[in-house]
Amino acid sequence: MVVNKQGSVKSIKRKARKSKKVVSGRAKEFTYKGYSLEDLQKMSMEELIKILPARARRTLLREPNYEQKKLMEKLESDEEDVKTHVRDVIILPNYVGKIVEVYNGNSYFKFEIKPEMIGHYLGEFVMTRKEVKHSGPGVGATRSSKFMPLK
């Protein structure tokens, strides 16, 4: 029986996945449509709008409302934690590294803005609905459940 010296098929696939993330021993550098993070941060708003997807482009071309303007000013300032209810603000390169707390309807969800989030809305990273976890039937749900002891 011939034994593969490299290992099983799973281990080979695992090594291939890992090699995509790391380029010759160093972490893969972030780029957005061919631009590095430093290039994106140096760009003017007009240049940045041209490379964003259509939905983000349309949102930024419109005049932001009062709450959006206020949040954008806070994100561009040196404040550490920014709490907000506004979920429809596009993440720009200037906001990378900031810690934001976004309201999900029940509580604030805290996260750090990473370069991969550029061009997305803040609300995309905060779930508003909880996953449903079903348990046993309640009292009166079935005929036999009438005789189940109450907790």
Swiss-Prot record:
Disulfide-bonded cysteines: none
Keyword Cytoplasm part of the UniProt annotation: no
Q: Where in this chain does the entry annotate a coiled-coil region?
A: none
Alphabetically sorted, this entry's keywords are: Ribonucleoprotein, Ribosomal protein, RNA-binding, rRNA-binding
Q: Which domain of life is it from?
A: Archaea
Q: Which GO terms describe its cellular component?
A: cytosolic small ribosomal subunit
Citing just one GO molecular function, the answer is: rRNA binding
Gene Ontology biological process terms, A to Z:
ribosomal small subunit assembly; translation
Q: Which HAMAP family match?
A: Ribosomal_uS19
Protein role: Protein S19 forms a complex with S13 that binds strongly to the 16S ribosomal RNA.
Membership in a protein family: Belongs to the universal ribosomal protein uS19 family.
Q: Kindly provide the name given to this protein in its UniProt entry.
A: Small ribosomal subunit protein uS19
- The species is Thermoplasma acidophilum (strain ATCC 25905 / DSM 1728 / JCM 9062 / NBRC 15155 / AMRC-C165)
